Amino acid sequence: MIIGKVIGSIISTRKQENLVGNKFLIVEPLEAMAGVGRIVAIDNIGAGIGETVLVVQGSAARIGCGMPEAPIDAAIVGIVDD
């Protein structure tokens, strides 16, 4: 699990059918996660720019989104209260 800050969003006019209607955000891992680059993560919980979030990757991301067959590598699964 990665803790990071949402720094932007991705707009995609065309995407795989099972991803239509989903929002993608750019997450910058916090300093404690040194060595991990920016992540594009699917957001099903309504996170916004500037919020600190929890991100999972791999099969945990697909399961966490309820889309086990979707081509998802990272998903936002929580918003951290400051």
Role assignments for model-derived ranges:
Residues 29-30, 42-44, 58, 80:
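A structural micro-motif recognizing beta-strand termini
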Residues 1-32, 36:
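N-terminal first-folded block
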Residues 52-82:
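C-terminal structural segments of small proteins and small subunits
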Residues 37-41:
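Short alpha-helix capping/helix-loop boundary micro-motifs
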Residues 14-16, 42-44, 64-67:
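A generic local secondary-structure boundary/capping motif
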